[in-house]
UniProtKB/Swiss-Prot annotation:
Gene: atpI
Record family assignment: Belongs to the ATPase A chain family.
Any single Gene Ontology cellular-component annotation: chloroplast thylakoid membrane
Chain ranges passing through the membrane: 40-60, 97-117, 136-156, 201-221, 222-242
Annotated organism of origin: Lobularia maritima
Main location: plastid
Protein name per the record: ATP synthase subunit a, chloroplastic
UniProt xrefs under PROSITE patterns: ATPASE_A
Gene3D superfamilies in the record: ATP synthase, F0 complex, subunit A
Entry membrane topology: Multi-pass membrane protein
Subunit organization: F-type ATPases have 2 components, CF(1) - the catalytic core - and CF(0) - the membrane proton channel. CF(1) has five subunits: alpha(3), beta(3), gamma(1), delta(1), epsilon(1). CF(0) has four main subunits: a, b, b' and c.
A Pfam family recorded for this sequence: ATP-synt_A
Compartments in which it is found: Plastid, Chloroplast thylakoid membrane
Stored InterPro entries: ATP_syn_F0_a_bact/chloroplast, ATP_synth_F0_asu, ATP_synth_F0_asu_AS, F0_ATP_A_sf
Length: 249
């Protein structure tokens, strides 16, 4: 037992169990002041944001009474997001449409960019580019934004009375209700991250093992599941906001 204890202590001292150092793949960092910034995520996120803003500006810069193809597409997307928000939040959905829409569009375009844009062709000093949602930092940030949003929604409508939900229907459930607020962002972030990472890894492995034509059906399936993941994230975010405003589980 003494030998085993000493061995474990030695391993820990050598840093072999530093969980914070565990990474999926190699990463490229920028050192800005005293902060280490994950450059890959910033670069790809800026590209996705530029695609969204550029597409919106080009499509609706000159609105027509009879919509053009681009304007018609964006109006369809807006109606879809409004329907999702209204279904999950209720009649007070209006102020939350921009937030839900931003989540859905950013995640959707991020997911598709991983399959459609040739990120791998861009050489970096270290690591390689990939979809923003292929990185846990992005998905955790989106999940935390959702948590802040539903706390704000509940507090803005009910004030401090919002916290009474933690002891309903009985105070015995207080620990479980508190734990639920931690599991929501965890489930949102890891579900999205895991699905997108797994999809890209499957495609990479298939391309390396078999001719390029064979993985194409898997790539199309990946595009479909990427869209579904964006819809799931946005729908759950809207549902959590609606739940916090209504005060029921």
């Amino acid at each position: 037992m003494t030998v085993l204890s000493c061995s474990i202590n030695t391993l820990i001292k050598e840093g072999l169990y530093e969980i914070s150092g565990v990474e999926v793949g190699q990463h490229f960092y920028w050192q800005i002041g005293g902060f280490q910034v994950h450059a890959q995520v910033l670069i790809t996120s800026w590209v996705v944001i530029a695609i969204l803003l550029g597409s919106a500006v080009l499509a609706v810069r000159n609105p027509q009474t009879i919509p053009t193809d681009g304007q018609n597409f964006f109006e369809f997307v807006l109606e879809f997001i409004r329907d999702v928000s209204k279904t999950q939040i209720g009649e007070e959905y209006g102020p939350w449409v921009p937030f839900i829409g931003t989540l859905f569009l950013f995640i959707f375009v991020s997911n598709w960019s991983g399959a459609l844009l040739p990120w791998k062709l861009i050489q970096l000093p270290q690591g390689e580019l990939a979809a923003p949602t292929n990185d846990i930092n992005t998905t955790v940030a989106l999940a935390l934004l959702t948590s802040v949003a539903y706390f704000y929604a509940g507090l803005s409508k009910k004030g401090l009375g919002y916290f009474s939900k933690y002891i309903q229907p009985t105070p015995i459930l207080l620990p479980i209700n508190i734990l639920e607020d931690f599991t929501k962002p965890l489930s949102l972030s890891f579900r999205l991250f895991g699905n997108i990472l797994a999809d890209e890894l499957v495609v990479v492995v298939l391309v390396s093992l078999v001719p390029l034509v064979v993985p194409i059906p898997v790539m199309f399936l990946g595009l479909f599941t990427s869209g579904i993941q964006a819809l799931i994230f946005a729908t759950l975010a809207a549902a959590y906001i609606g739940e916090s405003m209504e005060g029921h589980h």
